[in-house]
Amino acid sequence: MSATPIIHLRDVKKRTGVLNAWERVRNKPQVHWAMECFAEALGVFFYVYFGLGSTAAWVIGNILKQSGLSSVFQIGFAYAFGILFAIGVCAATSGGHFNPCVTIAFTIFRGFPPLKAVRYIVAQILGAYIASALVYNQWKVLIVESELLLKQAGVYETTMFTPNGPAGIFALYLLPGAQTLPRAFLNEFVNCFVLALVIWAALDPTSFMIPPVMAPFIIAAAYAGSIWGYAVPAISLNSARDIGCRLFALTIWGKSAAGGSYSAIAALVNIPATLLAAVVYELFLVDSDRVVAGSHLEFMNVAANHRRHRQQAEDDNLVEADDSSQEKPV
């Protein structure tokens, strides 16, 4: 039985000289990290851009008494679609973290380089900030109108920096009188723990029930489920989404948009929850005696047969062969 031939894109599709020249520069190790960071920023941009847009319709629609513009159900779908677009467009370049807690977990459990992790996290937060800036400018007229209506009604101070106010489109806040900090912590921790278990299962090569092609949909569904069930009690799920969007809210509205003690819960709780989920999955659900599913094996081979990876492996083999052929001193 003959082996499946390895065909790279350049073998079947010719690019122009300018693009080939750019690709040679872009793919140098000294430069390629910037492409990976760009992909991480773009992925978070997708996730945040679609989610915030739907949230803006919900918040502004409620203030302006325009029913039917959005709903929690629609917001969950918007974030889910953003995740699908992020993974589909960007994961092949960066590996598809799109969340600081995932990057930190990969650094601890999968040997991801710490310096690269810092770059990824900065890029992720930047992607969320840029998405916030665009959403704000696209909705600015209605946001300003909503602020004026709140001031005219005399409820600006009590509504503006809550989930029901224009600032709540971007930064995450507790619903006044409806949630305590300990319960917000519990809500965030449990949702992030469950979400991380789903992510780890989607990455498990022996998980034949979740082939690689289905992993984006499974992960997106987990995010949507958390939003549908627990957004009202307050969840963040993603440090980049929280920090990047909160920084933007601070840029527009100043310190009043900070969010108080809850901001620490929204930004940080997902990290220990994800790490604990990774430990639980590795200890209780990973089984090295299981067979690697064929779809996962194909996915792993595609990654391993990347042209630069193969070239590097061949170069390393040549160096090893050259070293072994040298006469050893007696």
From Swiss-Prot:
UniProt topological domain (Cytoplasmic) ranges: 1-40, 93-124, 179-183, 229-264
UniProt superkingdom: Eukaryota
Gene Ontology CC annotations of this record: plasma membrane
Annotated transmembrane regions: 41-61, 72-92, 125-145, 158-178, 184-204, 208-228, 265-285
Topology of this chain in the membrane: Multi-pass membrane protein
Localization terms from the record: Cell membrane
Motif NPA 2 per record, residues: 238-240
Family label: Belongs to the MIP/aquaporin (TC 1.A.8) family.
Role noted for this protein: Water channel required to facilitate the transport of water across membranes. Also mediates the transport of carbon dioxide across the membrane.
Protein name per UniProt: Aquaporin-3
Organism: Laccaria bicolor
Phylogenetic classification of the source organism: Eukaryota, Fungi, Dikarya, Basidiomycota, Agaricomycotina
Name of encoding gene: AQP3
